[in-house]
């Protein structure tokens, strides 16, 4: 993964995991990613997420290593490789539990995630110009001076900010 746009990398990893119908995935950590995941969890797009620091990382690594050795499934080896790769320096892995609306068909709660504000073109919106996503059925994730929130919360609090992504 590139370090040019870590948020876009996280969104791509989530979309790829949904297409593979995985139950969870690992991404490298950052404070902004954690705030975005809080919003996604609160809005019901993901089940949960957890930061794997210290003992939690050791337990998860041990469990994945055992599963990778026992299972012929290549997914387990991929998960183990991601865990090792993302636990470097001050970073730690984040485990994201995906949410599926229909367990049999594996229909995801996330239809699509689109990164709006990018490195070369930042997109800002005021209270009056805050975008509606899919006529109110989706959300816009907005970074304001009061923190990362949805477009609905930003309108309610009368805050503008950088539009990070659209999710529906």
Swiss-Prot record:
HAMAP family assigned: Ribosomal_uS8_B
One example of a Gene Ontology biological process annotation: translation
InterPro entries: Ribosomal_uS8, Ribosomal_uS8_CS, Ribosomal_uS8_sf
Purpose: One of the primary rRNA binding proteins, it binds directly to 16S rRNA central domain where it helps coordinate assembly of the platform of the 30S subunit.
Keyword Ribosomal protein: yes
Organismal lineage: Bacteria, Pseudomonadati, Aquificota, Aquificia, Aquificales
GO molecular function: rRNA binding; structural constituent of ribosome
Subunit description: Part of the 30S ribosomal subunit. Contacts proteins S5 and S12.
Keyword RNA-binding attributed: yes
Keywords noted in UniProt: Ribonucleoprotein, Ribosomal protein, RNA-binding, rRNA-binding
GO cellular component, one term: cytosolic small ribosomal subunit
Region of interest: Not found in other S8 sequences: 59-93
Family to which the UniProt record says this protein belongs: Belongs to the universal ribosomal protein uS8 family.
Name of the molecule in the record: Small ribosomal subunit protein uS8
Gene from which the chain derives: rpsH
């Amino acid at each position: 993964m590139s370090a040019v746009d870590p948020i876009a990398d996280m969104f791509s990893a989530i979309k790829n995991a949904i297409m593979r119908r995985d139950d969870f995935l690992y991404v490298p950590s950052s404070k902004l990613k954690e705030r975005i995941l809080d919003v996604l969890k609160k809005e019901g797009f993901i089940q949960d997420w957890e930061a794997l620091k210290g003992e939690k990382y050791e337990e998860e690594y041990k469990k994945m290593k055992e599963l990778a050795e026992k299972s012929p499934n290549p997914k387990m080896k991929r998960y183990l490789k991601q865990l090792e790769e993302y636990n470097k320096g001050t970073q730690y892995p984040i485990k994201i539990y995906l949410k599926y609306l229909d367990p049999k068909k594996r229909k995801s709660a996330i239809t699509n995630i689109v990164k709006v504000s990018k490195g070369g073109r930042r997109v800002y919106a005021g209270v009056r110009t805050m975008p509606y996503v899919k006529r109110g059925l989706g959300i816009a994730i907005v970074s304001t001076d009061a923190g990362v929130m949805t477009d609905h919360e930003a309108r309610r609090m009368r805050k503008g900010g950088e539009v990070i992504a659209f999710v529906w």
